Structures are given as C-alpha cells and as structure tokens.
A protein has these predicted regions:
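Glycine-rich phosphate-binding loops of nucleotide-dependent enzymes
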Residues: 2-188
Length: 188
C-alpha cells in the first residue's frame, strides 16, 4: 500500500486502517478504520469489552496490532511504540489519572520536562489563562476531584503540544457536575 490511506485527506490528523487485535483466540478488534481531522471531537461508544480502550492503547503504542496501519499527519507509523506516539503529538488521558498525590498540580504537570523552570511555569500559566480555566498550581494533587485530576492530565498533554488528546472513559467516575465541567474543557 502507498503512503496514502484510502480516502485520506490532508486535513486528517490521525487515521487507522484495518486494525485487528487478538488476545489469544479472542478477536477484540477486527478491521477497524477510523480517521480524525484537525479540531474534530470524536467519541467512541460501546459496551464494556467492546475494544475502545484497546484501540486507544494501539494508537498510543502500548499494544501492538495484529494487522493494520496507523497514520499521523499523513505519515505511516511503522513502529507502534509509546515514545513514537508522544513524539508525533498524541497524548492519552487515562481512565484513572496517574498523579503523584504529594506533589503540587504544577509539579505533576511539568514532571519529565527539562528546561528553565520559570519559562515552563510561564508557558503553563499562559495555557491555563488562554483557555480560561481556574486551577491552583500550588495545590497538592491528593486534594483534587477526579475532574480536576483529569484536567491536570489534559494540561500535561497540552504542555507537550499534543495534536491529538485521547480520553479513556473520561466520565466513568464523575458526578454530573464534573462531567459538565470536563465537557466544557474539551469543547474549549
């Protein structure tokens, strides 16, 4: 197959073609085709065990597909690895946020970054301000609600200049008010 995906346009940021994944004899995904354009919000809906999280983990390089292809910005990705996905601008907010409870919000967001701390801080403050969120960067992560923890995870992705943010079951542990707050953040 050529570098172009069937029907792919330059507007598509992420495309998967013919993704199949088996665990033993259990076929979890079979021939999945999906594309996401710039600025698009896409929702995958299905019951438990339908393969939504498996597909997300394949896109992130956590799982290897048995068949299929992945394209990011029109470039075929031949190596399904987390580091490749991150380098190409894909970031996944896990179902259960992975924060360090005794660290501050800012420390959790900036962990793993190198550079001048004040410049990173200023960039983070600008992102938060541009979006209009209110978040105390000095607050300990252990005091955050689940929705606030997911916002911290979203900010991690934004600080990494993610082109694609994948949210794995973002509403599963949230109250109605937290769901509304999270959807507002995603819409912004």
């Amino acid at each position: 197959m050529s570098q172009a995906v069937r029907g792919q346009t330059n507007k598509e940021l992420l495309s998967v073609c013919g993704i199949t994944k088996r665990f033993g004899l259990n076929v979890v995904l079979k021939g999945i085709d999906l594309s996401v354009g710039r600025g698009e919000v896409l929702t995958l809906i299905g019951g438990n065990g339908a393969g939504k999280s498996t597909l997300m983990k394949i896109i992130m390089g956590i799982y290897q597909p048995d068949q299929g292809e992945l394209y990011i910005d029109g470039e075929k990705i031949s190596s399904f690895k987390p580091v490749v996905s991150l380098q190409k601008g894909i970031y996944m907010v896990p179902q259960e946020p992975m924060l360090f409870p005794n660290m501050t919000v800012e420390e959790n967001i900036l962990i793993g970054f190198s550079g001048v701390k004040s410049e990173l801080h200023n960039r983070l403050v600008k992102i938060i301000g541009d979006i209009g969120w209110e978040l105390d960067l000095n607050r300990k992560a252990l005091s955050l609600s689940i929705a606030e923890q997911q916002i911290v995870e979203l900010l991690r992705g934004m600080m990494r200049n993610a082109k694609v943010l994948i949210l794995d079951e973002p509403t599963s542990a949230l109250t109605f008010d937290e769901v509304e707050a999270l959807f507002k953040v995603v819409a912004d």
